[in-house]
Structure formats: C-alpha cells, structure tokens
Amino acid sequence: MNIRVFLTGAFLCAFTAARAAGVKICFEAETAEKIEAPVVLVTNGIEGASGAYLEIPEGAGNPPKVTDGKAVFSFEVPDEGVFTLWCRVWWDGECGNSFTARMDDLPAFLFGEDATYKAWHWVKYPLARTAAPLRLAKGRHSLVFLNREDGVRLDQVLLSADRRFVPVDIEVPGLRK
C-alpha cells in the first residue's frame, strides 16, 4: 500500500513537471501594470534590454523608514508546473542587492543577495533545495517586487520550467515552449 501511494505521488509529480517542461515566460520590467514609488521607470535608451528598466534609486529609502514601493506584474502560465524565477538585475552594492518578492497569495520571499555588483546579471530563485519551488497552476498569476533595499535595478523577468536552463544575455520577451 505505501509503495503504491509513493509511486502514485512520484508519477503525479513527474506528470506535472512534464506538462510544463521547456516552458519559458519572459517579460520586460517596464511592462509592470503598477509601479509605486520609490520604484521608478528609467528610460535612458542605453541600459536595459529595451532601453528601459525599473529602479529603486540609491538614497530613495527602504524599510522600515520607507515602506512603500512595488512593481506588480501579471502573466499567463500555459501549463501547470514547477518554475524557476530568473531576474536580470543590477545591484549597487552589498546593501543594495535584493528585493522582497511575492507570487500570487504565497508568502513573500527574499530575492537576490548575490555578490555581483554594478553589472547586469541574472539571479535565480530558488537558490537551494531548502526553499520551496514555485509551483504554478495553469492560468493567470501575479508577481510583485517590493521595496527591500535601494540601489537596485530590474530589467527582465523570466520564469522557466526547465531546471537546467540558465539565461546568459538579454532574453527575447514572450512565451516559448
């Protein structure tokens, strides 16, 4: 009986992962449906994948002094699955290298805190097996980036159901299967 339950559970997990396998959803940060200060849209035509990005400027403030600030995104998932969240970011320094993020109504989580500064680069969540993966059902979802530290920039957001995929450069926005 226990073996049957285990095998059934393993089959369902594999089936769910297989349904979304290879799906990649990429969007530009400036497509946020809502931006609340101190998050600002920067359109300088130089940096960022499309010449624009979101930023919490250095010195703009962060919690607990400044509790406002967010960027809200909505996107469609074509098939249920387990996804890795990748963001193309630019960090000012060790005190400006993370966001708080929230997917749908799930608990908020820390995004970032790597040690690559003053360069555009990709960062992923979850980093380790200790963090819960992002299990997303087919349909509409909401992703919110909240003010945690100033001196941060966000250029692109990418969700991938392929655990082996690692973005290297600017990604083409849209859905790929």
Question: What feature does the model see in each segment?
Answer:
Residues 1-7:
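Bacterial N-terminal signal peptides that target proteins for export
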Residues 20-177:
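Extracytoplasmic
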